[in-house]
C-alpha cells in the first residue's frame, strides 16, 4: 500500500514544468525515496528504466564511453538489450547515486538533450560531492526528502484535509 507523501506534489509539479531538469532526490536511508519515485513513474510514464547502482554493480560502467546521452543509453542497452528508450515517454531512475556519483556529471547532457526525464536518488550518507567530476550546476534540481512528518502521518491514518487543518490550527 502506497502512503501519500509531500514529495508526490513536488514530483507532479516537476513533471508539468516547462523547464524540467534532471532531479536529484537526497535524504536519509529508509525515508521512502525509491518508493515515492517508482510510484510517481508508474503513474506518469509508459516506459521506466530503473537502475540501482548498489544492487546492480554492472551498471557502474555505463559512463565508460563518456557522459553524453547516446553513449550512456548504448552502454545500458549493451548490458540489458531489453531496456528500450522511447523519447518523451521514458524516465530513467538512477538509484543509490552514492555508489556511482559521476552519474551526476551526465545530468547536464540529459538536460540539454531533453528527450528523457531523469531522477537520481541517493542517501546523504556516503554521497561525496568531491568525488563527482562535474556536478552539472544549473542543469539539475535538488530535493531533500525527510522522514514522514506529522501531516503525512495523518494522511496515512486516513484523516481528511479538513480534519488535519483543524488539528494543525
Regions found by a protein language model. Name each.
Residues 1-169:
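Phosphate-binding site recognition
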